[in-house]
């Protein structure tokens, strides 16, 4: 998110899933790309909604090829990626839904009533140094959870806070 802002873009959160990403690109001509944390990326300019890692790699190399080569003053490939933040995050954690989906999500949302959050795709809670996401799966009777911190200590702190708020209603032992 911060790299998008630093590059002059405007990040927008939408629901997880290919169909939602494709719809976002179709309905927003100013959006040059869409992506998911799972690694799926969609470039708008030539084939909107086309998600192929080989194609995206070729396009990335094409874009990099427009800049001067390192021996002509351009940055090395490794230098380009060194500018990208490398924040620790949990794996995607799947927790079986016990009880109703709406009731469980309402309980989770209430547990974070004092926090800044987004409900575009489940509940994404903002922390000063990271975030926590809890969303119902689109395809299974489970909750999908993730967390990210600026460093390992902040990630641990976020997980501990989440556990203190909802650990009594959900088994969060896999969220690490």
Protein language model regions, located:
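Phosphate-binding and adjacent anionic-ligand microenvironments
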Residues: 1-146, 152-176
